[in-house]
A protein has these predicted regions:
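Short loop/turn segments immediately following beta-strands, especially the blade-tip
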Residues: 98-104, 228-233, 294-307, 353-360
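Short, solvent-exposed loop/turn segments at conserved positions within beta-propeller repeat blades
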Residues: 86-91, 157-166, 218-219, 277, ...
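Conserved beta-strand positions in repeat-built beta-propeller and related beta-rich domains
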Residues: 81-87, 148-152, 210-219, 281-287, ...
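Surface-exposed loop and turn segments in beta-propeller and other repeat-based domains
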Residues: 34-61, 106-130, 180-192, 235-258, ...
Length: 406
């Protein structure tokens, strides 16, 4: 059976441009909101819970426009939705939707996960290893564990941002809804954690104790690796992790801006034929149209990482370019079809490449393109009545059907 993938949680502003070029029938709409609302204030469509443990007046006021969902992960009937704290007034950075209890497509309820207390900021901004500050994206592994990086950082505008505590890698056992590992990232590894937007977990379901987390840092242009059994973290640095100046200009819903984001996403590919454990790892920068590949055995070698780029540099391979306007945030690999899917920022689309074919622009296709509803999250004004947030899903097989990636 094809892997069920949630292709994206995307935010659309009040600005609607262009026509729908590809039918949205290939993607199934799971949920949508006009805006998230505060259940404790008696809103008409309440779907979030606010904390009574406020930091200050701004924290105690639910920020409708600041609660912007950024990441989503599906697992066994539950959707784990992240809302990074980039503004005050966000009750929970990590949330869950029980799909069985939310059969309607409109305005599902977000519940703080694993509970409200863990998500609540302390009134004095004090560090607390039992609490989560800000999360961008999550991943569930084959052993029913939810992995994510808490940046520990409040990205408030106007110079109000602050590092509440050290960034930390969390692992929560979803069968008991409790944390089973929290690794505080040491300052010699990275000073601030807000540049870590994604995480990819490499584990064999038959050996849950041997797992590795790959975490890109678009700000420092590094790739961090955490070994669960080792209980340590190491890092790789490479010129391929940097942005490509030619592809730093973005145009989203007629809003033009420049980004310098380096390595942004990591996707674990298929197993090598001659090995039961060696797999290809794909990675790319946000401001780039290139894709890089490396063996997971390289990344799992702590000694090699310590020897430096002069030793391991040639192990990273530049596969080529995807084509014009294919700058991508996240991407994911489906082991059944062998297809790599991309969230393409500049053309409001989901792209694809069948990894069994040469890496050329001609072998890259578009699964879905929608200039009306699939607009990448940006600093846009929200429409109070129009739908602003959507979650779609589709099987990898049906998503790739009829494209060059089939």
């Amino acid at each position: 059976m094809d892997k069920l993938i949630v292709l994206g949680l995307l935010v659309v502003g009040a600005l609607h441009v262009g026509l729908r070029i590809v039918s949205a029938e290939k993607l199934e709409l799971v949920y949508q909101w006009s805006q998230l609302r505060d259940v404790s204030r008696g809103a008409a469509l309440p779907n979030v819970v606010f904390s009574s443990d406020s930091v200050n007046n701004s924290e105690d006021t639910f920020n409708t426009y600041g609660n912007l969902p950024m990441g989503v992960t599906h697992h066994k009937g539950f959707l784990y939705v992240t809302i990074p704290r980039r503004r005050p007034g966000i009750p929970a950075t990590l949330n869950v939707i029980d799909m069985a209890r939310n059969p309607s497509v409109n305005d599902p309820t977000l519940s703080p996960y694993p509970n409200l207390l863990v998500n609540t900021l302390r009134s004095d901004f004090a560090a607390d290893p039992k609490r989560i500050i800000s999360v961008y994206r999550t991943q569930v592994d084959r052993c029913d564990r939810l992995w994510f990086v808490d940046t520990g950082y409040l990205e408030y505008p106007g110079g109000a941002g602050r590092q509440v505590q050290r960034p930390a890698l969390w692992v929560i056992d979803l069968t008991i809804n409790r944390s089973v590992r929290r690794f505080e990232i040491p300052p010699e590894m990275v000073e601030f954690g807000w540049g870590i937007p994604n995480i990819e977990v490499d584990v064999d379901g038959s050996d849950c104790g041997r797992a590795y987390a790959y975490m890109p840092d678009y700000e420092q242009r590094r790739l961090y690796v955490y070994g669960l059994s080792e209980g340590r973290m190491w890092r790789f640095e490479h010129n391929y992790f940097s942005f490509e100046p030619r592809y730093g200009d973005f145009n989203v819903a007629r809003q033009r801006f420049t980004w310098y984001d380096g390595i942004f996403s990591v996707a674990l590919g298929g197993r090598w034929q001659e090995s039961s454990t060696e797999r290809t790892v794909y990675l790319h920068a946000m401001a780039s149209v290139s894709e890089i590949a490396v063996s997971n055995r390289i990344l799992q070698n702590e000694t090699l990482a310590q020897l430096g780029n002069g030793v391991y540099g040639s192990a990273f391979r530049h596969l080529g370019a995807r084509g014009p306007n294919t700058q991508s945030s996240s991407h994911a690999y489906d082991p059944i079809t062998g297809v790599l899917f991309y969230a393409e920022v500049n053309r409001n689309s989901i792209g694809c490449w069948n990894t069994n074919r040469p890496f050329t622009p001609d072998n890259h296709g578009i699964v879905h393109l929608d200039n009306d509803e699939m607009i990448y999250p940006a600093d846009l004004r929200l429409n109070r009545t129009a739908v602003n947030y959507r979650i779609w899903r589709q099987s990898a097989f049906r998503a790739a059907a009829g494209t060059i990636c089939e």
